[in-house]
UniProtKB/Swiss-Prot annotation:
GO cellular component annotations of the record: cytoplasmic vesicle lumen; vacuolar lumen; vacuole
Pathway named in the protein's UniProt entry: Mycotoxin biosynthesis; patulin biosynthesis
Signal peptide: none
Basic and acidic residues biased stretches: 305-316
InterPro entries in the cross-refs: RmlC-like_jellyroll, RmlC_Cupin_sf
Main location: other
Record-given protein name: Probable oxidoreductase patJ
EC number: 1.-.-.-
Organism: Aspergillus clavatus (strain ATCC 1007 / CBS 513.65 / DSM 816 / NCTC 3887 / NRRL 1 / QM 1276 / 107)
One annotated GO biological process: patulin biosynthetic process
Region (Disordered): 291-323
Amino acid sequence: MAPFVPYHSSAGQATIVKFGGLLTTEFLEPPPGRCFLFRQTYRHTVEGPIPENLRKLINSPHKPKGPPPHFHQFQTEYFRVETGVLGIEVDGVLRRITPEDGEISVKAGSVHRFFIHPDSPESMTVYLSASDSGNDYQLDRIFFENWYGYWHDALLHDGGIDWIQFLAIQDGGDAYTPAPAWVPFRRQVGYWTCVIVGRWIGGLLGYKPFFREYTTDWDFAVAKMKGSVFQRHLVHEAFGAEKSWKQQTELEARVKPENAEFEQWTEDMSPTPLMLKPLAYEAGEFKGLQDQSANGVNGHATGVEAKKKQLGDMTRRRSGAQE
């Protein structure tokens, strides 16, 4: 398969909603010693009329109710249930966690998974955080923005998870899929499979761990990828020179440039006035379509009589130039 291209954008959002509300993540300021903190809510289902592909996913074995089994090589992860019941399996031991249990930890290297427990009512809300290893690739906001963005798009719109893309993203967040339990040294095998296939081979084939469409702090993501010789070629840095919209407007000329005999093709030559409504966007936000006209014409077209005169003047100029 070709390297993945996102289907939606969620960068810059403190709260991201995936799978039609089945999963909601709220990014928060982390406490000292932790590299991220978010509050996350899983629902058992989404009621009411929803798109067919979402209903099919909810009714399938692949319904998002928690991440697959994984381990973190360098970080300890922390969980604190706010409401509902969290199911968590750590190194084969299954536990049922409620708000009364307070904060629990999963040590680095422990194979674990967590999920909304069947005993939980309609939803389950939990606070998650992790220790700060100081590594380029670790559990942090960038990783979770990209993992949840990809998970959503892959299951709903892309026909499922691409194994190389999955490993590339997981490797970008110190999250590694262990080998089956019967494989000796399953953690080591899982770790090096993610690194070799996800980072090294995937990087050479064009697979990125992070995407601009999902990532709020893109400068940080670029710095992470530049740290790997296998991913450095995937990084584009011209975005750093892009000016803000305000700066772009300051560069706009006060008058339209003239183009000599090529001018007519840069003007509105239609004899019919172009009637436009008031702008529907303000500061990038959609304000809704309006019925009334802004001012009769849009300023780039003229009335019929004026247009006839304009066309006549252009015709005379062309004729004079050809004589």
